[in-house]
Regions:
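Sec-dependent N-terminal signal peptides
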Residues: 6-8
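Positively charged n-region of N-terminal signal peptides that target proteins for export
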Residues: 1-4
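N-terminal signal peptide c-region/cleavage motif recognized by signal peptidases
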Residues: 11-17
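Short, linear, compositionally biased motifs with a strong N-terminal bias
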Residues: 10-11, 83
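N-terminal alpha-helical modules
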Residues: 17-124
Length: 124
């Protein structure tokens, strides 16, 4: 647990350092670039957690995880984006916070698998 917290702290401080140039974006496009970087980091963590968890699951668990993930993606897209006649819009703050929450959910399920055994019923 101490190693995990240290790794989390190092990642957070490294991430904060990398994003320090984004603290005061000069214009909206710089701000969008910075928000996208944060989203990409969250999405990478989500995908890493998904793969780690899937590797621990039996066939039924993998199917439940896949179904749950596809449902989550659909909900995220519906909540954080919209399309109208003038274009397609994504609320990156919504997408990022939703992705971080899902990554944490997957990490929690992975920890359960490694400590007390995988519970497929908790994957939904």
């Amino acid at each position: 647990m101490k190693k995990f917290m240290l790794a989390l702290l190092l990642c957070a401080s490294g991430s904060a350092f990398a994003n320090s140039a984004c603290d005061t974006p000069r214009n909206d496009f710089d701000g969008l670039y910075c928000l996208n970087k944060v989203y990409q980091e969250a999405d990478k963590e989500l995908n890493d957690n998904y793969k780690k968890l899937a590797a621990k699951l039996d066939a039924n668990g993998k199917q439940s995880l896949k179904s749950s993930q596809l449902s989550w993606i659909s909900e995220r897209n519906q909540s954080c984006s919209k399309k109208d006649s003038s274009g397609f819009y994504v609320n990156l703050d919504c997408a990022t916070s939703t992705t971080i929450k899902r990554a944490q959910f997957l990490q929690d399920r992975y920890r359960e698998c490694t400590s007390s055994g995988c519970q497929n019923s908790k994957l939904q």
